[in-house]
Swiss-Prot record:
The UvrABC repair system catalyzes the recognition and processing of DNA lesions. A damage recognition complex composed of 2 UvrA and 2 UvrB subunits scans DNA for abnormalities. Upon binding of the UvrA(2)B(2) complex to a putative damaged site, the DNA wraps around one UvrB monomer. DNA wrap is dependent on ATP binding by UvrB and probably causes local melting of the DNA helix, facilitating insertion of UvrB beta-hairpin between the DNA strands. Then UvrB probes one DNA strand for the presence of a lesion. The beta-hairpin motif is involved in DNA binding. Forms a heterotetramer with UvrA during the search for lesions. Interacts with UvrC in an incision complex. It is found in: Cytoplasm. GO terms for biological process: nucleotide-excision repair; SOS response. It comes from Methanosarcina mazei (strain ATCC BAA-159 / DSM 3647 / Goe1 / Go1 / JCM 11833 / OCM 88). Coiled coil: none annotated. This is UvrABC system protein B. Residues 453-612 form the Helicase C-terminal domain. One of its GO terms (molecular function) is ATP hydrolysis activity. Keywords: ATP-binding, Cytoplasm, DNA damage, DNA excision, DNA repair, Excision nuclease, Nucleotide-binding, SOS response.
Length: 670
């Protein structure tokens, strides 16, 4: 990372030895920048969470209703606690939203983004029933790869760091000790030969390219070396005078203008998987020993397949330093024992870092399930001679391994699950919204005539220009209800798991635009359904206990109407189940607290105004594209998909990817 002030501490005897000195400890404190002060439930929540962390309580839960400003509360906690922080979200889209929010709150500190760098990923697998081997197929997004490197480089060089990550942060990553040890520092006045610098850059996976400079590459012109580190946008220019570093400066990549001079610059490796040469040799020896042990355990075909593949991979590693699927040998390169956990992003943090798990009721189950899913896929690869058993150790963390990092944890959720409640020393509530919006009124009505009744309610809200959501228990009921409403001249659509992502997004967009008035669905808890135009929610068969009718699910469904100041919710039930009682009581408790706050502060709640996004493409348009034009259209769409991913607009990137797949199928069908 770049530093423009004088270094502290003496340069080690080996001029390329990593220095982890006072610069790390002297990094600036967090500085929260915001136009507003904590309000509503926020001040008390901030105070309690900070108090719990200072008292060394490892687990706390922030129970915050939608729209109460949970992210702002967490930002205030980070600002006071001043520890490097990891925020985990359960998908890329939510991670991108949090990343942008934290960047606005902390413009003077390092806010980084760490998610899977694949725009498209087909894992390696083998289907024994069909005798079908599926090779790994992936499309890496270079911008996200750059952001991942920036995250680890920041963690190595300063304390004022917030990393927003998806659950991919528990997957294997290069050894942080190697990443740190193989980096090197250059200072103005250093005695060093140009050849030494170039060799060191090659050692840490930089590529020389004198024509096209991009992250992870360098070029050489006489005594000037231009580098773009893998985690950087601009050029770092090293100017030598003989065998001495004469000048180090940052140069704008686009204009070529010098932006600033610096006293020194620390160059981290261009990739996370970097292995010192001596360790590479010993790792290859261990891999060959494992191969010899494994071959007698396999059949003739499988042993031949494994031997041929492994020897080829070792030859590639010796020649080029890498091979396809090198991560499957990571246990040997990391010198880990069989079954020992892999290194991951969490190992780049200091021991006492702050961990925030957003939407914990969804994120914790994801973290639980990662390991088993990975192992079951690899089992057939190992059993049939496509991979050595050590491939099992290229894996995500087991949940019990992840728990060992949970020393300062804040779970954030509107509906915390049993895990969070059982582990937390305190559950801090954040019920009052600074905006004044109140949870909707909830009414329970009998099952008899529920369809006719819900239809009457829909007509009322349509007259005032609002929309409605209706939840059913099965896909068949959703389709039948939609058809019944249509016959009664109510514009309705249904939404369920069979509908593709791109169509689902477009259905929600058309609901907001008023092209239809009612959306009928089964599980309306998924992201993307925060629709302020919704003024009524009807929950059919609410007394049928189960996943979609338990108290947590009911509270979440009711919360979908909390963005509209005049919204109402009706539950249709003959039996007041414990789940219904709990959901109604909790909603009424939250309503009364918010109403009292509004009256005390003279707040009149108003419906949230949320812009409606432009349509990306019309999927029906593909039928009208001439077959000869499809390849060019795919090229254009691929560029659009990458641009969307670069902007962290993953919803749009997924839409375009789905369209590309549709067009590729049409080409194959010709």
């Amino acid at each position: 990372m770049k530093v423009s002030s004088q270094t502290t501490g003496e340069l080690a005897e080996n001029k390329f030895e990593t220095i982890y000195d006072e610069r790390y400890w002297e990094s600036p404190p967090f500085k929260l920048v915001s136009d507003f002060e904590p309000k509503g439930s926020q001040p008390e929540a901030i105070e309690k969470l900070v108090d719990g962390l200072k008292k060394g309580e490892p687990f706390q839960t922030l129970l915050g209703v939608t729209g109460s400003g949970k992210t702002y509360t967490v930002a205030n906690v980070i600002n006071q606690i001043r520890k490097p922080t990891l925020v985990i979200a359960h998908n890329k889209t939510l991670a991108a939203q949090l990343y942008n929010e934290f960047r606005e709150f902390f413009p003077e500190n390092r806010v980084e983004y760490f998610v899977s760098y694949y725009d498209y990923y087909q894992p390696e697998s083998y289907l024994p029933a069909k005798d079908q081997y599926i090779e790994k197929d992936a499309m890496i997004n270079p911008k996200i790869e750059q952001m991942r490197l920036a995250a680890t480089a920041s963690l190595m060089s300063r304390q004022d760091v917030i990393v927003v990550a998806s659950v991919s942060c528990i997957y294997g990553l290069g050894n942080p000790e190697n990443f740190q040890k193989m980096g090197f520092e250059l200072k103005v006045g250093d005695k060093v030969h140009r050849k030494e610098i170039l060799e060191k850059l090659i050692d840490i996976q930089f590529e020389r390219n004198d024509l096209e400079l991009m992250p992870g590459r360098f070029r050489v012109k006489g005594d000037t070396i231009d580098i773009i580190p893998g985690y950087f946008d601009d050029i770092i220019r090293i100017e030598l005078f003989g065998d001495e570093v004469d000048r180090i400066s940052e140069v704008d990549k686009q204009t070529g203008q010098r932006k600033e001079d610096m006293d020194y610059f620390f160059v981290y490796p261009a990739r996370h998987y970097v292995i010192p040469e001596e360790e590479q040799k010993s790792a290859i020896q261990f891999i060959l020993e494992e191969l010899e042990e494994r071959l007698p355990e396999l059949g003739l075909l499988e042993s031949h397949r494994l031997k041929q593949r492994t020897l080829y991979d070792m030859e590639m590693i010796q020649e080029t330093g890498s091979c396809k699927g090198i991560e499957n040998y990571s246990r040997h390169f990391d010198h880990r024992q069989p079954g020992e956990k892999p290194f991951c992003l969490l190992d780049y943090f200091p021991d006492d870092f702050l961990l925030v798990i957003d939407e914990s009721h969804q994120t914790i189950p994801q973290l639980h399930g990662m390991y088993n899913g990975d192992r079951s896929r690899k089992k057939s690869l190992v059993d049939y001679g496509f991979r050595l058993p050590s491939a099992f150790d290229n894996r995500p963390l087991k949940f019990e391994e992840f728990e060992k990092y949970m020393k300062n944890v804040i779970f954030v959720s509107a509906t915390p699950a049993d895990y969070e409640r059982e582990h937390s020393s305190r559950v801090v509530e954040q019920i009052i919204r600074p905006t004044g919006l109140v949870d909707p009124e909830v009414e329970v009505r009998p099952l008899e005539g529920q369809v006719r009744d819900v239809m009457q309610e829909i007509r009322k809200i349509v007259e005032r220009g609002d929309r409605a959501l209706v939840t059913t228990l099965t896909k068949k009921l959703a389709e039948e209800l939609t058809e019944f409403l249509a016959k009664n001249e109510i514009k309705a659509r249904y939404l369920h798991s069979d509908i593709k992502t791109i169509e689902r997004t477009e259905i929600i967009r058309e609901l907001r635009l008023g092209k239809f008035d009612v959306l009928v669905g089964i599980n309306l808890l998924r992201e993307g359904l925060d629709i302020p135009e919704v003024g009524f929610i009807g929950i059919l068969d609410a007394d049928k206990e189960g996943f979609l009718r338990n108290s947590k699910s009911l509270i979440q469904i009711i919360g979908r109407a909390a963005r509209n100041s005049s919204s109402r919710v009706v539950l249709y039930a003959d039996n007041m189940t414990d789940s219904i009682k709990s959901a109604v009581q909790e909603t009424e408790r939250r309503r009364s607290m918010q109403i009292a706050y509004n009256e005390e502060h003279g707040i009149v709640p108003t419906t949230i105004r949320k812009p409606i996004r432009e349509k990306v493409v019309d999927i029906t348009d593909t039928k009208h594209i001439p077959k000869t034009d499809i390849p060019n259209v795919i090229i254009e769409l691929d560029a659009e998909m990458r641009e969307a991913a670069d902007r962290l607009d993953f919803e749009r990137a997924i839409q375009v990817r789905e369209l590309i797949k549709k067009l590729e199928k049409e080409i194959k069908a010709v």
